[in-house]
Amino acid sequence: MKLRRMRVAAAIAMAIVSAAGFDLSLLNDDDILRGGTVHAPQEEEERAFGASLSHSSSGSDSFSASGSAPSFSASGSGISLSTSGSAVSLSGSDPEASFSTSGSDASGNDGSLSASGSDFSFSMSGSTPSFSASSFDASSSASGSELDFSASGSAETSTTSSAGSDATTTTSGSGGLLAPFATEEPPETLFPRNALGEMAPIINVAKGLLGKPLPTNKWWGNLIHTTAEELNTKANPGWSNPYAVKLPKEAPYGIQACYSYNYRQLSALTDGVAEFYLHDFVNDITLSATEFAGEAKPIYEMYSFSDFGIKVRACLENKQQCMDSALVHGMAFITATYDRLTASIESEYTMKIVDKSVPGKYIIDLGGNQTWVVYTGNDGSFTIDESGKALVSSKPFTGTVRVAILPSSEATDVYDKYRTCHVRGGNVSVTSRTEYLLQWETVGKSCKTHGLLHFALPHHLPVLKGAITAKNPKAIVLNSATRGKMVAQVTTTGAWTLSEAENDLEVDFYPTTKPSAKMVSKLGLLKTLQADIADDWGLNKTSWYFNGKQYQKYASLCLMAADVAIVGKNKKLLNTCLSKLETLLEPFLDNTLAPPLNYETSYGGLVSSQGFTANDVDADFGNSVYNDHHYHYGYWVTASAMLKSLHPKWKRMKELDAMIWIMLRDVANPSSEDAFFPKFRHFSFYLGHSYSHGVTPMADGKDEESTSEDVNFYYGMKLWGQVSNNKAVEDLGSLMLRLNARAIRTYFLMTSDNTIHPKEFVPNHVTGIFFDNKAAYATWFSAEKYAIHGIQMIPVSPINAMVRTTEFIQQEWDDILSKEPIVTEANTTNAWLSLLLVNEAAVDQADALPKLKKATMDDGLTRSWALYNAAARSHSAKSQQPRRA
C-alpha cells in the first residue's frame, strides 16, 4: 500500500513538472524563505537512493506518459489521475489519500493541485511544485531500492542509483536561458581525440560516471584528482564552507571534516600588513566506522554530482556495508547515513560528552576549545571509547549521523529544529537575465514544515530575497575560510531566489562615453591607429593564451577603425584591418594553429594538445589539464564577437561560428543535455566567480588569479550572443557577468572598508592568488607588486569599469601603485606600466595620458587601444556599475 501510494505520488509529480516554465519565488515569513522546488524527504535514519522517473509495474498500478505536452495517466486500486493539455482530473478512493485541484492550467501559472496520503504529499500552486514522500526499503540489504524524486524550476531531473559500483546518473534539461548551446559531438576530423590517463589520474569515482563529462574545476575536485606519485598515499581536502572535508587515505577513514577558521594563520607582518593567510586542516570530526580498520579500508566512490556538490559513499569490499554522504556548498551539517556499520565519530582531540540528556543527541567538547553537536537518531546508544577520542555506537547501526560545530550555546536550539532536513545537492535555475535560483535537493521529514538550514556567503545577502542577516539575534553565523562570514538561511522550499539588477553602465564593444573629437585630435589617435594596423601581426606564440591575447588586441583595432569619431566616413582603414585579421585567423578555423586543439575524453573538453606532445601538465599554463580555459578562450570569444559585429557576412563566418560555439560549450555549457561537455566548467553560481585550476590536486584547493580575464570571458559570451542574435546566450552571459562582477568586488578587490579578509591583509587591496583555503598577495609568475595588481587589469576593456570602481582605483593608486618605482622613476621600458596608466586614467587622466603616449605597451595592448580607453574614463566617472550587461 505504501509503495503504491508513493509511486502514484511520484507519477503525479512527474506529470506536473513535465509542464514548462515554473515561476519560483521566495517570501520572507518569520525568517523562513518560501519559494518553489520539489523535495524528496525521507526519515533521517533511512538511506536515499534514487529511482528513475520512468516507471512501469505489473499488478494494480499502471502509469503512462508520452511526449512533451502535459498528457499523463495513472491508475491503481483506488487512485486515478489523468491530464490532457491543460486539464487535470484526479480521483481517489484510497482512504488514506486525498486529492484536490483548482484552476485549469496544470502547466501554467494559475492552477493549483494538491495530493496527500499517509506516506506522501504533493502540492502545486501556480507553477510551484512541492513533493514529499516517506522512503521505503525494498529489502534488508544495501542493494535495495528507494524512491527519490526531485525536480525544480523548469528542469526535469531523474536520478537512479544503487549500492556497489553503480553510479547515479542525473539528467536535467531546461529550456530558455539554460538551453544547451549545441549537443552534437565535436567532429573528430577537426579535433583529434586524446585522454589524460596517467597524466592526471581520476580516483574515487564510480565506474558508471567514467567516460562521461565530469566537472573539472569544482570545489570538490581534490577529492577525485591526484597524481601518479600521490595515487595511494595522499588525500587533499575540499572546502564546501563553512567546513573543509576530506576522504582520508589513512585512519580514521570516512568523511573527515574541519572547521577551517579555527586554524587560521597569518604570515609575518611587514609594516602591519600580511602577505598571505591560510588555514591548517585538522581532523576535528571524522564520520567513520569501527569496521574501517586495518586492512579493511573503505572504498570511496563519488556516484553523483550536481552544480554545487557531490554524493559519495564509503563501503567495505563486500559493498553491502556502506556509509553514504552528500557534500554540498554551504551545508550546515556534515551528514552520513550508515547501513549495518558500527558508527564511530572520531577526532584528533580528546572528547568529553557535555550533554546527552536528549535521546539521540550528544553535545561534545573537543580538546577543551570547541564544542560540536552530534545527532544520531533514536536507534542505539553511543559512548566514548577507551581512546577517549571516539564516540561509538553500541552495535551495528543503520541510520543517519549529523554533526555541526556550535558557535554558541544558543545555536543548539536552532540546530535541533532543522536537524532532520538534509541537503543532498543543488543546481542553478535561471528565470531571466536578472534573476536566478539556487535550488537545493533536500531529504528529510521536516523540510517542508521547519525547512532546510543552509549557509549563505556575503555576496548573496544583498540580493537574496528574504535573507536572514547577521543582525538577526537568532542567526547562526560561521566563518568561511577565505570568503568571510556565512549566515545560515532557512527555506521550506529548498530554493533561494537571487537577483542581479541591470546596472548603470551600458555594456557594449565601446566605452560608454567615447573620446570626444577634440580628444581624438589632441592624442593623435588616427595616426597612432594607422601605425598599429600597419604593424606586423602574428599568431605564432604556440600558446592558446598568448595567441588569444594577440587576437583580441588586433580585433580591438578594427573596432577603433569603425569609430567615425576617429576615421570619419572613410572605410578604407577598417577594410584593411578586417582583411588582415581574417587572413591571420584562417589557421584557427581548421585547427591547424599551433598547438592544435584536441577533444579530451576522460573529462570531456577542448584542450591544447601541447600537454600531450610534451607530456607536461604545465604546458600552455596547464590548458591540457583544464587550467585557465576561461582565460584562454575568453580572448577568442570576445575578439570573434568584435569581428562578427564588424563583418557578419565574412565568407568564413560559419566556420568561425563553429569554433566559437565549441569554446563556449567547453567553458560555459549550461545544460546536461550536452553529452560532450560538463555544465559550467569554471563558473560557480554559488560562489559567483570562476575557478581557474583544473584536474591536478592543490593543497589549498581551487584558485582564481586574474579576475579581469575571468570577466573578459563572460563579457565575450554576452557580446557573442548579441551579435549572433541569440537572446538566451546574451542574457545568460549578461547575468553571469554581473554576478561575477559582484563577487569580484566582494572578495578579490578590497577597498579599505573590506570586512571579508583579515584587517592585516586588506591594505594589499587585491587578493593576488585567491584559493579556497588561502589568499596570497602574489602571482604564479612574479612577486612584483605591479604584476600582482596588473594581472587584475588585463585585457584593457570597457567592461573593466563594471568591476574596478573609481573608489577602489583611487585607493589602490594612492596606497600602493603610485609609490612603486615603475611609476616614480619614469620607467617607460617596463610594459606593465602601460596597464597601470590606463587604470590611473580613471582617477587622474591628466597625469596618465601624456605618460601613456610614451610607455612601452603590454604584449596584449596597442597604444591606440590604451589611449582610447584611457581617454574614455575620467575622474568624473563615479563608481560605475553597468546598467545593461
Residues covered by each model-derived region:
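N-terminal, immediately post-signal peptide pro-regions of secreted/luminal proteins
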Residues: 22-108, 112-134, 141-154
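Inter-helical turn/loop segments and adjacent helix faces that build the functional surface
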Residues: 561-568, 643-655, 717-731
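Polybasic, positively charged surfaces/segments
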Residues: 713
